[in-house]
């Protein structure tokens, strides 16, 4: 938090192409590293995201993992992660470029009461990763993450039966 106002942070203003972060989640059970809740959490996220956005180049990106959160004492999900998404975009005046889902099948069952004890919910095995930027066209190149065509697709292309023409 204090980095953005430090001498080192000030030197980096407008010079960072990518910031990838996973801030502390608003957990129901407190942890040693901090556990802000509700409006306090949203205010904190807004302050931090404004500072991070100031570090970005004009075509830079901020990528944030926002974990799921549950309402205390009931088997319902909190809206705080979605409010966090909106707070980051609004407070920092950033565009939401894309959403990714991080599926973690090895995640411990949770929330434990509702998954293991009462058996009312399934394991919460994913989190959202949100890509923000100052511009609608940030520095990006999807060719860096493409996977090879399947054999079936290669055969379609080879036969010429695949219509790779203009799309609407």
Which residues are covered by each model-predicted region?
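Core catalytic lobe of class I
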Residues: 1-168
């Amino acid at each position: 938090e204090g980095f953005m106002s430090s001498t080192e942070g000030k030197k980096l203003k407008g010079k960072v192409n990518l910031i990838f972060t996973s801030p502390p989640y608003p957990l129901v059970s407190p942890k040693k590293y901090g556990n802000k809740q509700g409006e306090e959490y949203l205010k904190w996220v807004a302050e931090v995201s404004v500072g991070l956005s100031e570090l970005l180049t004009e075509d830079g990106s901020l990528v944030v993992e926002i974990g799921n959160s549950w309402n205390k004492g009931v088997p319902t999900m909190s809206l705080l992660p979605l409010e966090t998404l909106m707070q980051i975009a609004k407070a920092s005046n950033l565009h939401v470029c894309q959403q990714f889902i991080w599926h973690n099948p090895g995640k411990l069952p949770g929330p434990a009461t509702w998954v293991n004890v009462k058996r009312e919910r399934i394991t919460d095995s994913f989190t959202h990763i949100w890509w923000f930027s100052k511009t609608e066209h940030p520095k990006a190149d999807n060719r860096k993450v493409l996977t090879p065509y399947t054999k079936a697709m290669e055969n379609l292309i080879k036969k010429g039966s695949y219509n790779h023409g203009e799309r609407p």
